[in-house]
From Swiss-Prot:
Intracellular or extracellular location(s): Membrane
The enzyme's E.C. designation: 1.14.-.-
Class of enzymatic activity (EC top level): oxidoreductase
Domain of life from the UniProt record: Eukaryota
InterPro entries listed in its UniProt record: Cyt_P450, Cyt_P450_CS, Cyt_P450_E_grp-I, Cyt_P450_sf
A single Gene Ontology CC term: membrane
Entry-linked Gene3D superfamilies: Cytochrome P450
One GO molecular-function entry: monooxygenase activity
Gene: cyp520A1
Signal sequence range: none
Protein name, per record: Probable cytochrome P450 520A1
Length: 536
């Protein structure tokens, strides 16, 4: 009986202490403490977060402001839904927030935090220069990358034509991912995977694609193994499943590496990015052994393959959905393309794309209303610090950039839930007239224009779309290759509308739901298939 009483007292003490820890003030000055909801013992604010954290965090920002704190089980988070605070944390104070938070999923994925995506600052500083040089605008505008994109796009257009002639629904999940994956595989490894299951030897492509999808779900949704690390032994099956999916991708890349290292010649021009990495790592004078270098090269390739495949494919899937729901806009895009390239032209080139203002506006609007990485990847504060208005941020706080929340907030965008590409055309006109002031990537509180007052709240960033729509993040650890995404998606959009009319394969679904399914990249919540009609 005494033992039972002791256990009850112990549990009660733990619950009370945990409640106190999660709700106490961390700043010595009460008015400098970040707002936030009350957190419960053990779970913190998990009960406030549904299956779409991007939506939940955005709703909470309406109550608690542009930066607020919330506990998810054992970790304190601060959610930032304010462009000025984002500029301060992610750019001005970059060095204090450069690291990613550690959890079991990121640790397994990243060779114990040595990768480009999840690497700690020292490792990240080593590997980033080796990768970014391959994805500059100059490199992407060179002949080989353009040739790879054109080749893959023409193959996809051919498949679309076949589907249109047969009136067969198009499985955009498979074919868009094939298109995106083959571009990055061509750049990295000089290979491509088959566009049809009949040519998929041993189902290898399907396995890799499925594993990439599962990896994204695991990383993006913060499973219980990450939220409750003290209960890790109870989640061995989940960790094992994640590891198995990662190994499918690793084995695929490793098999290519072993083939390529046999024919690698440092005296000839690199054939692809893997050749460049092999050359750079084996010329380094560091003490890493050959196996460690091999694994790091494979890891960097995985980083790019996983990130580049899903983001471009998801953006194109959203494009198809919004075109089906907006047939008049679809025709406007067609007219624009025809006016630039001519009605008899079968293919839009890279040189044509800069002339397609409405196509680009449509692309930017998709990334605003459904940014594929809606919460970006989190950072962690490396020391006690403050942000604007002296709001205190304790050391080891996870910081989340609410990209979705800013682009979909009435505080920053007029009619934010409406898909309206023309807002970007108007924005460009306003920007050309310098209506938003002279701003660079640092915080600028001068020469800014207060655009409107909404619900009593004045925002100098209202409808300043490039400031409030940041689909690739900001700062040094933003998406490494936004130019590549622009290249791959814009030319695909233009050629699809030039050659086809898009409709839903099931008229009963119309209009298609524009709700999203949350993961590290967001996708349409409800499956749909596209019916292509070939334009005459």
């Amino acid at each position: 009986m005494e033992i039972l009483t002791f256990i009850i007292y112990l549990i009660t003490f733990f619950i009370l202490f945990d409640f106190y820890k999660k709700n106490k003030r961390y700043s010595k000055s009460p008015n400098k403490e970040a707002n936030g909801p009350w957190s419960l013992p053990i779970i913190g604010g998990l009960h406030l977060i549904g299956d779409r954290p991007n939506r939940s965090f955005s709703e909470l920002s309406k109550i608690y402001g542009g930066i607020y704190k919330i506990w998810l089980a054992e970790r304190m988070l601060m959610i930032v839904t304010d462009p000025e605070i984002i500029q301060d944390i992610w750019i001005k104070q970059h060095d204090k927030f450069v690291n990613r938070p550690h959890n079991i999923t990121s640790q397994i994925f990243s060779l114990n935090h040595k990768s480009l995506v999840f690497g700690d600052v020292d490792e990240w500083n080593k590997v980033r220069p080796k990768m970014t040089c391959h994805f500059t605008k100059i490199k992407l505008n060179s002949t080989k990358p353009k040739q790879i994109v054109n080749d893959q796009l023409k193959k996809m257009l051919k498949i679309m034509t076949t589907h249109s002639l047969d009136s067969k629904p198009f499985n955009q999940y498979v074919y868009l991912n094939t298109y995106s994956m083959n571009i990055i595989l061509g750049l990295m490894l000089s290979i491509e995977l088959p566009h049809s299951n009949s040519n998929d030897k041993d189902g290898q492509f399907s396995k890799v694609l499925h594993s990439i999808d599962e990896i994204f779900k695991s990383i993006g949704t913060n499973g219980p193994e990450d939220i409750f690390p003290t209960l890790l032994p109870f989640f061995k099956n989940r960790i094992s499943t994640f590891t198995n999916h990662l190994n499918v991708i690793k084995d695929f890349i490793r098999s290519i590496y072993k083939q390529q290292i046999k024919t690698f010649d440092i005296n000839i021009e690199p054939r692809n990015i893997m050749d460049c990495l092999i050359s750079e790592y084996y010329e380094d004078d560091d003490q890493e052994d050959e196996v460690a270098k091999q694994e790091l090269i494979i890891q960097l390739c995985i980083d790019m393959l996983v990130a580049a495949t899903d983001t471009s494919a998801s953006t194109l899937e959203w494009f198809m959905l919004f075109m089906i729901n907006n047939p008049n806009l679809q025709e406007d895009l067609y007219e624009e393309v025809v006016n630039v390239v001519g009605k008899d032209c079968p293919y839009v080139t890279f040189d044509d794309v800069p002339k397609l203002a409405l196509i680009k506006a449509c692309y930017f609007e998709i990334l605003r209303i459904r940014p594929v990485t809606s919460l970006s990847l989190p950072r962690v504060s490396m020391e006690d610090t403050t942000t604007l208005n002296d709001i205190f941020i304790p050391k080891d706080t996870i910081i989340i950039q609410n990209i979705f929340g800013m682009g979909n907030s009435e505080k920053f965008v007029s009619n934010p839930t409406v898909f309206n590409p023309s807002r970007w055309l108007e924005y460009k006109k306003m920007k050309d007239l310098n209506q938003f002031g002279n701003r660079d990537d640092s915080i600028d509180t001068t020469n800014t224009t207060t655009n409107t007052t909404l619900n009593g709240t004045t925002s100098k960033y209202y409808n300043d779309l490039e400031r409030v729509s940041i689909p690739f993040g900001v700062g040094k650890r933003r998406c490494m290759a936004p130019s590549m995404a622009d290249h791959n998606v814009l030319i695909a959009m233009a050629n699809i509308v030039l050659n086809f009319t898009m409709k839903s394969s099931d008229p009963k679904q119309m209009p298609l739901s524009e709700e999203e399914q949350y993961a590290i990249t967001i996708k349409p919540k409800y499956p749909f298939k596209v019916l292509f009609e070939k334009r005459s």
